[in-house]
Amino acid sequence: LVFFTRSLYDLITGLLDQWIKRFSCGEMQYDPKTNSKLRVFHAWGAKEQPGLYRIICEHHGKRPGTVQNTNERQPNRGLIDLSKRLLEEITIEPMFDAILIDEGQDLVAEDDLKYQDKQAIYWLAYQSLRPADSEHPEQKRLIWAYDEAQSLDSLKIPTAPELFGIDTNLNKAVTGSYKGGIKKSEIMRRCYRTPGQILTSAHAIGMGLLRPEGMLTGLTNQKAWKEIGYEVVGDSKFISGRQITLRRPPENSPNPISEIWGKPVLEFETYGSRQEEMKALAEKIMHNIVHDGLNPSRDILVVILGSTYEAMELETQIAGFLMEYDIDVYIPTALKLNDLVPQYPNHDPDKFWHEGGVTVSRITRAKGHEADMVYVVGFDNVARNENDVNFRNQLFVALTRARGWANLSGVGSYPMYEEMRKVIASGESFTFTYKRPPKRDIGDSE
């Protein structure tokens, strides 16, 4: 089982243990230290924590590359660069029976890093697999899951043609059904974690559906919208100048919090200064802990938006401010609470939560995690770049970490703030004018 965000180890091993116990009626459990047949890896790997790329290198007697061995600045592009080089240097021998890839959208890059028109990491994984059927050696157990709306770096979507290029046999491998009727591709239209009001708002603001200049990214046909849980009201086709109405039926958002709570579960507030924003944040978190009975760790999460530099700076600033309010904080990878700048070697890259502290995290480490109450801070860092799809994806990822409630805040005044207010006011139905094809059409699924 492979994933990209290293801080997910605790969550994924916990879920494996939970569901193995469930399906074995308590007779089996998962312990990563003793179970050698089911391995959990992050995609890259390190000396103290094996990963897919590193394990494959070592199996073939090759020295694994590190961040120092690539000129790529983004971690995922660095890994893809090294995977491409490995494929160019050696022939990969089969060593696994099955590979399941989560966060598949983070393991693709632009065409300049492809290996023979294929996405390098996926081809590396495919080559390292034993055939599932000796008579059909091209059939291998490579399973990947992705959410294109959560891509923070690349606009590529991990469809079979994108991953495997012009190889028609592999492209057909994910179409149709297996014997017995099991679909080879499954699109999840129902969301259990995030309340409907938050999910629809995250989709709308992430895609820019109510953006005055027109949507930036999204789907442009009824079938594709239906597949992710929406209805296109009427017989509307996505033609320039035509009005489109989308609705998400309640059965596709079964999280009951909105109905039980009876009040908005998504709030958006703006402030005249960062100081005001942080003061309001501290007071709300203190109220959650003292009056609402939420635990600081795992129940509450603060997610920081912005570019790498902006988010790092704001993360430290907000964590320090919360400490002044006697709120213990945890910065992911730190070995203890209230360590605002954890650094190698005194850090733990696998760690995201710490008992007794509110986790304050940049979006890249928050991916995959969830909490009852999520505070999304620094909306202004996105609003200044409102026509950037990756920045909007940050907003989508941050809001959908919420199991119950989300609070979004920013400073200053930007046109995107008014767009957000319209999104929230629209509820679970959106009406907009389709103006032109989006920068990124994510409806090209298999």
List each language-model region with its residue ranges:
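Post-kinase regulatory C-tail/linker adjacent to protein kinase catalytic domains
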Residues: P32-T34, L219-I228, P437-R440
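Conserved active-site loop/cleft motifs that coordinate metal ions or position small ligands
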Residues: I143, N407-G410
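Core RecA-like ATPase module of SF1/SF2 helicases and allied nucleic-acid translocases
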Residues: S154, T159-T200, M207, E213-T220, ...
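Short, charged/polar "capping" segments at the starts of alpha-helices
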Residues: D10-I12, L152-D153, Y309-L314, Y414-E419
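Residues that line or immediately flank small-molecule/substrate-binding pockets and catalytic motifs
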Residues: E103, V108-D111, I304-S307, G378, ...
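Short, glycine-/Ser/Thr-/acidic-enriched flexible segments
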Residues: L79, D106, A149-Q150, R365, ...
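Alpha-helical nucleic-acid-binding subdomain
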Residues: L1-C191, P195-E213, G234-P249
